[in-house]
């Protein structure tokens, strides 16, 4: 049964006894098309997806198809177990949580699945053998938008097990959309680490010529084995070409583009390292990193009764009051500029603070730090109990608050922890180089 299809497309495939992985030939509008039926993620219920011989996928409406012929039924997939694949004396453990970074497309069956075994990963990228002995595990296979705090805990526990077994580092394959949330969660959860935990993803799927999968994975393994720091980091393309990746601190990184391969950038911080793909060398860019420890200490728990509030002109205090009455324990505000909302929120925030709700302020600008002492509105909001959170990214502040609330109930103690630099999330000194200047009069658009 074509499980990924629905509506008219599903009816068409069922009528002709076709399934994902079958090779078919069909005729429409006098044109014959041959290909493998692939899974679909389209919202259109009358489209089927075929993988052509040239490797490209096309979508075809099932309406008015004149003829369809089965060329070959799909080949049965070999049964594969999920879980750890035992490799003695591994140096780097690869933990897959989803995404396309280590996915393998089986054109014989139309299936897309994670590359499970170390042998498959090495087949995917033989150069790995020259870098490290690896082990691999599928923890779960989910889209990153479906990531949850309880999954962060499982990832942290598996990463600790891998480090405790003697691996020099851990690579976590993760979808890119929520990778920064997970990297922040792991950063706060690990108090001590014997080696790096490297989150890596892919902006382009592994079946595309422009895929960044291979380079990102290989350089991440290099970082996990050889980097001198004991931190949670994100390693992704540093530019649009295939020359180097950048290693970002897990609490100071953000996805800043929807599709570019170099979408991830350090915000209010410099990358920790630059990894040269051709030379397979790590260039340390900052000595301000957490050193490796002799043991791994994990404290992973989160309270998700929080809310990330983006202020905008016209936001009603009544809406925020209703939100607070829902039982949340904390709010992170993305305020304007130096950290502002309308002064109309003074009474709402004051009451919430008295009721024990933590309210922290970050900036929509992302770059720079909040300073609520400059203007009257900022000073009033502080009087109401709003806490300025330095140069923390909104998403990082949200995850930190979830971690803090799981450990403390006293509001004063919560404020104290939120203003304590636990994992490098607060940078007290900003340099000129930390702000990217995207335009220097060098490009003239025609």
From Swiss-Prot:
This is Glutamyl-tRNA(Gln) amidotransferase subunit D. Its EC number is 6.3.5.-. One of its GO terms (biological process) is regulation of translational fidelity. It catalyses: L-glutamyl-tRNA(Gln) + L-glutamine + ATP + H2O = L-glutaminyl-tRNA(Gln) + L-glutamate + ADP + phosphate + H(+). GO terms for molecular function: asparaginase activity; ATP binding; glutaminyl-tRNA synthase (glutamine-hydrolyzing) activity. Pfam families: Asparaginase (PF00710), Asparaginase_C (PF17763), GatD_N (PF18195). The keyword tRNA processing does not apply. Residues 90-421 form the Asparaginase/glutaminase domain. SUPFAM superfamilies: GatD N-terminal domain-like (SSF141300), Glutaminase/Asparaginase (SSF53774). Heterodimer of GatD and GatE. It comes from the Archaea. Allows the formation of correctly charged Gln-tRNA(Gln) through the transamidation of misacylated Glu-tRNA(Gln) in organisms which lack glutaminyl-tRNA synthetase. The reaction takes place in the presence of glutamine and ATP through an activated gamma-phospho-Glu-tRNA(Gln). The GatDE system is specific for glutamate and does not act on aspartate. SMART domains: Asparaginase. Keywords: ATP-binding, Ligase, Nucleotide-binding, Protein biosynthesis. Belongs to the asparaginase 1 family. GatD subfamily. The active site is at 100, 176, 177, 255.
């Amino acid at each position: 049964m074509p499980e990924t299809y629905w509506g008219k497309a599903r009816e068409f495939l069922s009528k002709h006894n076709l399934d994902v992985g079958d090779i078919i030939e069909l005729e429409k509008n006098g044109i014959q098309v041959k290909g493998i039926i692939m899974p679909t993620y389209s919202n259109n219920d009358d489209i089927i997806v075929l993988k052509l011989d040239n490797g490209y996928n096309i979508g075809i409406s099932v309406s008015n198809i004149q003829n369809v012929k089965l060329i070959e039924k799909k080949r049965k997939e070999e049964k594969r177990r999920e879980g750890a694949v035992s490799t003695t004396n591994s140096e780097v453990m690869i933990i897959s949580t989803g995404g396309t970074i280590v996915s393998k497309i089986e054109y014989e069956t139309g299936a897309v699945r994670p590359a499970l075994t170390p042998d498959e990963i090495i087949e995917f990228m033989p150069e790995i053998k020259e870098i490290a002995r690896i082990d691999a595990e599928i923890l779960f296979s989910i889209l990153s938008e479906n990531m949850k705090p309880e999954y962060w805990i499982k990832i942290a526990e598996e990463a600790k097990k891998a480090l405790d077994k003697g691996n020099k580092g851990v690579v976590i394959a993760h979808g890119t959309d929520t990778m920064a949330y997970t990297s922040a969660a792991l950063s706060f959860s690990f108090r001590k680490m014997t080696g790096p935990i490297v989150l890596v993803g892919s902006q382009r799927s592994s079946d595309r010529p422009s895929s960044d999968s291979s380079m990102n994975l290989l350089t991440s393994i290099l970082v996990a084995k050889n980097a001198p720091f004991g931190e949670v980091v994100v390693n992704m393309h540093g530019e649009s070409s295939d020359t180097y990746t950048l290693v970002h601190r897990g609490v100071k990184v953000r996805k800043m583009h929807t599709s570019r391969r170099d979408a991830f950038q350090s915000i209010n911080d410099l990358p920790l390292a630059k990894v040269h793909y051709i030379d397979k060398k790590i260039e340390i860019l900052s000595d301000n990193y957490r050193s490796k420890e002799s043991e791994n200490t994990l404290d992973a728990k989160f309270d998700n009764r929080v809310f990330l509030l983006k202020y905008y002109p016209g936001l009603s205090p009544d809406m925020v009051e209703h939100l607070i009455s829902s039982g949340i324990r904390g709010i992170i505000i993305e305020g304007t500029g130096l950290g502002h909302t309308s002064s109309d929120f003074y009474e709402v925030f004051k009451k919430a603070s008295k009721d024990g709700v933590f309210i922290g302020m970050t900036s929509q600008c992302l770059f720079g730090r909040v300073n609520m002492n400059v203007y009257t509105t900022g000073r009033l909001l502080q009087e109401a109990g709003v806490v300025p959170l330095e140069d923390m990214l909104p998403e990082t502040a949200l995850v930190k608050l979830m971690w803090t609330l799981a450990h403390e109930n006293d509001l004063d103690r919560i404020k104290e922890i939120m203003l304590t630099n636990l994992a490098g999330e607060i940078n007290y000194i900003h340099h000129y180089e930390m702000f990217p200047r995207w335009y220097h009069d060098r490009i003239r658009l025609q």
